[in-house]
Amino acid sequence: MKLTDRIENGIVILEPKGKIMGGPDASLLNEKIHEYIESERKKVVIDLSQVEWMNSTGLGILISGYTKLRNRDGVLKLANVTDKI
């Protein structure tokens, strides 16, 4: 998995590409989400348009980020979710 990130109008946009499964690649996404949360960013969008596959580890990362942001009065949204995901 590759990951690009940027900030537009105060909104963090993360764009993973490839498969989100366990291991170092999934850790990268998890770390990046939590890095932005710790830096007080309250709005995160994860664009899944280029994600080919996601297992339960990947789903757990998304749920963890969503929960942590919600607990800090923030929001995590998923964009461009394919039927496969």
Predicted regions mapped to residue ranges:
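Short beta-strand/loop segment at the start of cytosolic alpha/beta domains
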Residues: M1-E15
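Amphipathic alpha-helical interaction surfaces in cytosolic regulatory modules
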Residues: I20-I85
